Amino acid sequence: MSKNQEISKKEQYNLNKLQKRLRRNVGEAIADFNMIEEGDRIMVCLSGGKDSYTMLEILRNLQQSAPINFSLVAVNLDQKQPGFPEHVLPEYLEKLGVEYKIVEENTYGIVKEKIPEGKTTCSLCSRLRRGILYRTATELGATKIALGHHRDDILQTLFLNMFYGGKMKGMPPKLMSDDGKHIVIRPLAYCREKDIQRFADAKAFPIIPCNLCGSQPNLQRQVIADMLRDWDKRYPGRIETMFSAMQNVVPSHLCDTNLFDFKGITHGSEVVNRGDLAFDREEIPLQPAGWQPEEDENQLDELRLNVVEVK
C-alpha cells in the first residue's frame, strides 16, 4: 500500500467517525424533542452555509435507516443579493437527487429601501425571510421546518440574552412559529460547530458566503462567540457542561417568581430540591463529568477534499 493510500484510508476512517458522531448527535436531539414523526414532510432551509449543508446531509443519511418514514424538501431563499451565485444550489441538489424549491424574493431591495445607510439590516431581513419561509412551508405542505442552528448558536444566544438583554433565554431545539401554524426544529442542537466545520471541509460543500448583502456581523454576538471559544480552549469540556446546564434548570434556586412560588414558602413547607444543602461544598471533578478528549482531534483537522463518499 502506498503512502498516499494509507493517508486516504486514515482520512476516510476519521471522516466516518466524525459523521457517526454527528449522526448520533442529531438522532439524540430528534428523539429527545420528538422532532420528526411518521409521515412528516420536513422543509430543510438551505442557505448555502456549512450548517445547513451538514443538516441536509445528516438528515438524508438518517432517512435511509430510520424506523419511521419521512420526506425532505430543501428550500433556499434567493434574496437577490448582489453576487449571489444562483446556479450553485440547484446544481448541487440536482446532483444529489433531492427535491428542492428555490424561492426568489427581492428582500435585499426592500431592506435597502427601508433601512438608512450604515444601520444594521439583519433584523428586518430576518423578519422578511421568516415570513417567506412560513408561507413556503404552507405551499409545500411541510409539517416541520428544519433550521441549521447548532449547539454553539444555542449557547451564544443564552449568553447574549443574559449579557445584553437581562433574560435567561436561549434558542429552543423545537418551537411553535410566531404565527402559530408551523413547528420549527433544530436537528443540529446537540452538534458542535467545530465538528460541523470539519465535516463541511471534508465534504467540500459548495459554500456560499453569508455576507453578500454587505452587512456587518452582530458585534454583541461576536463578543459572546469569542468568549465561548476562549473558554473552550482554556477549559476543555466546560462548553459541554454549560449546555448540560440548560437541560438541568432548577427554578427553585433561581429568582423568577413566575417559575417558582417563593411567596408560598412558609413554616411547614416541604423542602424543595434539597433546600440550602444544595449550596454545601461538593466534590467537583477537575474534568467535566462525561467528557473525554478525543484521540483523533488533530487528525480531524487534516480532513479536506481527499475523501470518498461515506456509505
From Swiss-Prot:
Main enzyme class: transferase
Main subcellular location: cytoplasm
Subcellular localization: Cytoplasm
Gene Ontology cellular-component terms listed: cytoplasm
Catalytic activity: cytidine(32) in tRNA + S-sulfanyl-L-cysteinyl-[cysteine desulfurase] + AH2 + ATP = 2-thiocytidine(32) in tRNA + L-cysteinyl-[cysteine desulfurase] + A + AMP + diphosphate + H(+)
GO biological process: tRNA thio-modification
Record's keyword terms, sorted: 4Fe-4S, ATP-binding, Cytoplasm, Iron, Iron-sulfur, Magnesium, Metal-binding, Nucleotide-binding, RNA-binding, Transferase, tRNA processing, tRNA-binding
Cofactor binding note: Binds 1 [4Fe-4S] cluster per subunit. The cluster is chelated by three Cys residues, the fourth Fe has a free coordination site that may bind a sulfur atom transferred from the persulfide of IscS.
Essential cofactor(s): Mg(2+); [4Fe-4S] cluster
Described function: Catalyzes the ATP-dependent 2-thiolation of cytidine in position 32 of tRNA, to form 2-thiocytidine (s(2)C32). The sulfur atoms are provided by the cysteine/cysteine desulfurase (IscS) system.
Listed name of the protein: tRNA-cytidine(32) 2-sulfurtransferase
Organism, as annotated: Escherichia coli O7:K1 (strain IAI39 / ExPEC)
